Swiss-Prot record:
One of the record's GO molecular function terms: double-stranded DNA binding
Summary of the function given for this chain in its UniProt record: Binds double-stranded DNA tightly but without sequence specificity. Involved in DNA compaction.
GO cellular component, one term: chromosome
Name of the featured protein: DNA/RNA-binding protein Alba
One GO biological process term: chromosome condensation
Length: 89
């Protein structure tokens, strides 16, 4: 499934437009919004703007929370929170 939008450091509207594009031009029934760390709040903002303002017919199917274990520069293991929001129409 290629209908995944990874949320990072760009502005919220960039990701909102990416989700809307996936639903409209790709004719997708589901779009997954993924983020980790500090970008989690931005991913929630994207979901809220899509479902409340731009595409009210889109609903939340599932929200998954988790933790990624990544290796720090000093060799220590770091836990980073992750979120996956599955939207459908």
């Amino acid at each position: 499934m290629d209908n995944i939008v990874y949320v990072g450091n760009k502005g919220v509207m960039n990701y909102v437009l990416a989700v809307i594009t996936q639903f409209n031009s790709e004719n997708a029934q589901e779009v997954i919004v993924k983020a980790r760390g500090k970008a989690i709040s931005r991913a929630v903002d994207v979901e809220e703007m899509v479902t409340k303002r731009f595409m009210p017919e889109v609903k939340i199917k599932e929200i998954n929370l988790g933790t990624d274990h990544i290796q720090g520069e000093d060799g220590k293991s770091i836990n980073v929170s992750t979120i996956e929001i599955i939207l459908f129409k």
